[in-house]
């Protein structure tokens, strides 16, 4: 019954597809292979540079591309969703059987194993994306089962799985390492059978042979090293990349943190009990528990190894029950374990947010625009609809740079069109190319050389997150350059075209007065009323389009300009009419509304809006001061005192806040 509950919960967790942009690459790669009848090894996905020689492209994920392209032709995105679910369920079913074997005859361990399986599933759920790493996860999960039930049949089953794995993902290297660990002599006191090591050695031979026979072959290790070298170069220039962001550990509120905490405790228990110190179980757990602290992306890899390891720990803690009969207390323990996992990690068992890109090569309708999408989804759709972006420079949400490919179109009546793709594969670039792309952001001369060599005609830029963001200086360089014209912007991105672009003459759509790019890098709005009026007029025209009407950030800029002119009534009229979801911009808009109502002495409305804007993690001294004034006017003196404390914590020398604090203290308000 407990295993049935775990299986149902895992099946529910596989519902809903979050399409990563990597799917576009694998569709393209698989389509090229099927069309050409061979595996391409040319580095043709990136902007060519005349002084950088092309590099051999190992294409070690070629088979995954073929499978994804075939499935997509058969069932579209629903087929890819099904493929994703099958890989995830297969992986954790392997892990479940391995956990059952590891639990042995201990009734407590067998009843707790489903809860541990769900915990591992919940911890890994952040990586349930339709990408080749799911093949690696399924392969590694199969290995956790085979090493615990070695035999010739297992080796025979591993042969096709290894060939599939080696041609789908580079992390077959993890499988080889895992199999090698199981060659370590067992000194735990619970020795494996004498001939088990022979089968483990056979597993290593099968995996290594499969990797050597893949198109990547001997390049696999070099590819991994190239990836980390690219990461080092990025970090040195101040960028970050989610692919190598280490997991932060907090021992509460997270299924992955709980999984890691339990695994550490189990390893330490085995270490200090001495008799279980050096054995494959402990060494493999110790090796794979480190991976999430290198990159949080590896939590799914660690989960499939740690869950079977943990499944045997209850039997080791209570060795007297190892051969006992199951009792109601064991069932209660298992039910409570499952309930705890479902309670503390329920979101992973519900359909995730579906962020599916529009069918490739087809103009997206106006209602497909999603202002709240990830950078730079909407910008790419704008470029595609207008036939732009042939020579594009930008980066994606991970800090990687844009490449190109001919995108297959889901509608047979539409011809394939060239469309940008966000390349997450630094290892496919020559070192010089990576370095030139990155230096172009921080060095003006390097940027001019790169833009000339690659004939770049389009730029997509993200909004800089803070003053130290490397893109901030690049944005300043582009925003004040006569060579580039701002033609489109939304809540996540700014789009520029070269001033010589024919599209500018044909469409004539540019932003000359409404320039949020310049306002961001200078922190200065237009000085004259005439300039502010011109900027407002441009933004109003932009908001009249289906796309512009969904951009929330434009409301912020318009409200700022109106408040600078002292027009509180127009600000309220503008913002109160908003009926769309404001997402991450809600606090900012609430702050504008609160200030506007305060200027009209409508203190209750001002207090309500400012209280929302000042919720954590707000850190604006002016916002807290405005909230304190509104609270005091509404006679919420305790709230006013708290807001003043937060204000002075941000800026201890804020003179008006100090005056208000003295006034409240003189009135005998508690807290001063």
Stretches found by the model and what they are:
Residues 48-78, 82, 86:
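Short hydrophobic/aromatic helix or loop-helix immediately within or flanking a transmembrane segment
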Residues 204-205, 308, 317-352:
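Signature aromatic-anchored transmembrane alpha helix within multi-pass, membrane-resident enzymes
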Residues 22, 34, 39, 170-272, ...:
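Transmembrane catalytic cores of multi-pass membrane glycosyltransferases
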Residues 349, 353-418, 426-672:
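C-terminal luminal/periplasmic domains and tails of membrane-associated envelope-modifying transferases
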Residues 113-114, 149-163, 196-202, 280-285:
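Short hydrophobic alpha-helices at membrane interfaces in multi-pass membrane enzymes
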Residues 9-10, 120-124, 141-146, 155-170, ...:
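Membrane-interface alpha helices of multi-pass inner-membrane proteins
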Residues 140-156, 266-275:
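Membrane-interface transmembrane helices that cradle and orient dolichyl/undecaprenyl
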Residues 82-104:
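Transmembrane-helix motifs of polytopic, lipid-linked glycan transferases
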